[in-house]
Regions:
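Helix-start (N-cap) detector for alpha-helical repeat units in TPR-like alpha-solenoids
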Residues: 27, 61-62, 95-96, 129, ...
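Register position in tetratricopeptide repeats
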Residues: 39-40, 73-74, 107, 141, ...
Length: 197
């Protein structure tokens, strides 16, 4: 989420097209349609189509992941949190839902929960660069909180102001849009037919 400088996995046309090849045209068309509706600024239609698909295939992790992304994009953080939490319970081996769950927790200022979710994502996928970057952002936020509290307790400290300034500058740069745009990560993939019913 922009205001906490965490990067979320999201849906893109390239991913939808890749899914077409991997999952077969009929199923992938559903993913592509939902992704296209979301990109066209029609999140309500995208959500309705995702919900209809999930009604027939409730164990499909890709569409459930897309549904969580749609809810996040709609600003429905509580619903998105439920969606991603359910994914982590049903498919604990998938790192992407943990990453998105962490972004939602961080947006709410729940940095300890965000850290735990990101550590799980990294344990599941040790080369998950986005999760590592997000974990760094969470540690930065936790550092800012700790330095701020320490300064409240010891206003005369000479070592705290430069540390606070450094951490604040780090996040001010990210919030002004100077930081690179987040990369697009695919929704979780499963073997065709496995757990899709």
């Amino acid at each position: 989420m922009k205001h906490v400088a965490l990067r979320k996995s999201s849906v893109s046309l390239a991913i939808a097209l890749a899914l077409c090849m991997v999952l077969g045209i009929a199923r992938a068309d559903e993913y592509a349609d939902v992704g296209a509706l979301l990109r066209q600024g029609k999140p309500d239609e995208a959500l309705a189509k995702a919900d209809a698909y999930i009604a027939g295939k409730p164990r499909d992790p890709q569409m459930r992941f897309m549904r969580g992304v749609i809810l996040s994009e709609q600003g429905r953080g509580a619903d998105a949190t439920v969606a991603f939490t359910q994914l982590t319970q049903d498919f604990p081996e998938l790192p992407e839902p943990y990453n998105n769950l962490a972004a939602l927790y961080a947006a709410q200022g729940q940095f300890d929960k965000a850290r735990a979710a990101l550590e799980t994502a990294i344990k599941l996928k040790p080369d998950y660069a986005t999760a590592f970057e997000n974990l760094g952002d969470v540690y930065g936020r936790l550092a800012a909180q700790s330095y701020g509290r320490a300064q409240q307790l010891d206003a005369g400290s000479k070592s705290l102001p430069p540390k606070l300034t450094l951490v604040r500058q780090l996040f001010a740069t990210a919030q002004t849009g100077v930081a690179a745009a987040p990369p697009i990560a695919p929704p979780p993939r499963r073997t065709v037919g496995k757990n899709s019913k």
